[in-house]
Amino acid sequence: MCLVAPMQCGCASCVRILDALLSAMEALVQMRLLSEEEKTSCASQFLELAIFAVENCRGGRQALLQARGEPASLGEVAGKGPAAD
């Protein structure tokens, strides 16, 4: 899901996030000193960071909501960014 959002958005920021995430995941796979549990933990943290970063981009946030099957907030539908809490 976190890979779909930056690919759908396609802005420079989301493309950089996607590139960095894929590079980090590739490096993680090649690390032979880490246990499988440590690799899984690191991968989860990378994904959480990617989701956080994508949510700070309007297009990325909307793509992430679509990927999750969630409706956009009223403020986002009106093009005003995220609704205030």
From Swiss-Prot:
Subcellular location: Host cytoplasm
Main location: host cell
Domain of life: Viruses
Alphabetical UniProt keywords: Host cytoplasm, Host-virus interaction, Inhibition of host NF-kappa-B by virus
GO CC annotations, alphabetized: host cell cytoplasm
Biological process according to GO: symbiont-mediated suppression of host NF-kappaB cascade
Assembly with partners or alone: Interacts with host IKBKG; this interaction prevents NF-kappa-B activation.
Role, per record: Plays a role in the inhibition of the host NF-kappa-B pathway by preventing ubiquitin binding-dependent regulation of host IKBKB activation by IKBKG/NEMO.
Protein name: Protein MC005
Gene that this polypeptide is encoded by: MC005L
